[in-house]
Structure formats: C-alpha cells, structure tokens
Amino acid sequence: MATKAPEKITKPKDRDFLNHLETYLSKRDGVDKLLKISRYATKIILASSLIPETRSIIPRLKSFESSVGVSRKAFRLGKFVQDINALRSSRWDSNHELVLLIIAYGGEGLYYFVEQFIWLTKSGLIDAKHSKWLQKISAWAELVGYVGSVSIKIRDLRKLNDEESCVASTIEISVSRGLACDGEDEKMKMIKEKKTLKVLSILQDLADGLMTIADIRDGKGVLSAPNVISSAGLFSAIVSTHKNWISC
C-alpha cells in the first residue's frame, strides 16, 4: 500500500549513482519494491504464452514467484507502527478529515498487523488452517485503507489545483504589469511536480486496490484475470520504486 504522507519534491542532487543506490537499498521499502517488481514481472511471464508450459523453467519461475511473495511479507514486520505514528502526527481541520485519516491509516495499519501472522503461517510457525481467514481480514483491511487513502489524495489534489490557479493568476497579473515573477514560476513548477506525483500515487492505490478486490473475490471476474492483476502489480511497484528513489 502506498503511504499517505504528502509527496515531497526534492531538487536534483549531484550524487554518485552507487551511493544513491546504497541509500535506496538500505530502506525497507526500497528492497520490498524491487522484490515486488521481480515478482509481478515473473507473474506476467507466467500468465502470458511467452514460454511453453512444457519448458522446465516454468516450475522454477512459479517457485521463485511464490518465494518472493513470502519474502515480501517479512518486510511488513512492525510496519503497522508507522501508521500509528502517522495518525498521531496528523492534523485535520474537520471531523470529516479525521474520519478519512482513521480509515486510511487504520485500514493500512490493521493490514500490516495481520500480514505478520500470515507470514508466520506461510513460514510454518502457525497452523496453515488459519491462513484463509487471516488473508480475508488482511484483504478487507487493505481495501478500507485504500478507500481512505484515495479520498485523502483526491482532496489534496483539489487543494493543489486551487493553489495552482492562485499562482497562475498572480503570474498573469505580474506579466500584465511588466513585473518579474521568477519566484512564482518556480512555485508553479513545484506545484505541477507535486500534482504529477499525487496523480501517480492515486493510480498506484487504484492498481493495488484492484489486486485487493481480486483477493477478496478469490480471483473471480474479468478484472481478476492473471495478466490484468500482474500488470497492475508491476505498475504499482514501478511507481513506488520511482517515488522511493527520488525521495532518498
């Protein structure tokens, strides 16, 4: 799930690529999203007809995909704490905003909390008979979190649109009066970059939400087809990787 914290725009830095990569890989989300890319890229290959079913590599790809899926769950250990802290540090202007924050962070936090037990069932410590109902709770909590997350981000996008209109009006007035507006131009550029990241983040949540609905419906329906879900997962992973890369 995409984190609901505001997207930060940082100015490009002249950084050594390997140093930047080291910083990226030192983060939990950095490694997790690379695993997510490899998993869903593998699922796309398996869902397509690129490799005949009779080839010996198919069982190995299926084993790899399954192992990566279990490995990713280990990265969720304790991750629910970030949602608790995010909710504690949040600010709101109305009860409506507070409800959205509770839905978003509460849903995601419960999802990450339950995922720890799912990992323990996959690892064999907890009896596998508990796996199905734990996965249902996890999926519903995740879906609730996405509803709150998308709602908050749409609200933020509207605020950015209002801010963009205000800055555009200021620039127009400055130009008509023959005044310099370098500061406003830079501000407009920053707003547009924030809007781009916000839109990508919304699309990422929608893609992840589609996969969650497929889990709830046990893979039934046209939108739950393996190639559709795999493509949504890969898109989400690439967006997350991009956001994590530019933020570190």
From Swiss-Prot:
Lumenal topological domain residue ranges: 119-220
Membrane protein topology class: Multi-pass membrane protein
Compartment(s) of residence: Peroxisome membrane
Transmembrane region(s): 98-118, 221-241
InterPro entries: PEX11
Keyword terms, alphabetized: Membrane, Peroxisome, Peroxisome biogenesis, Transmembrane, Transmembrane helix
GO cellular component, one term: peroxisome
Ranges in the topological domain labelled Cytoplasmic: 1-97, 242-248
One GO term of the biological process aspect: peroxisome fission
Subunit composition and interactions: Homooligomer. Interacts with ARC5 and FIS1B on peroxisomes.
Annotated protein name in UniProt: Peroxisomal membrane protein 11A
Record organism: Arabidopsis thaliana
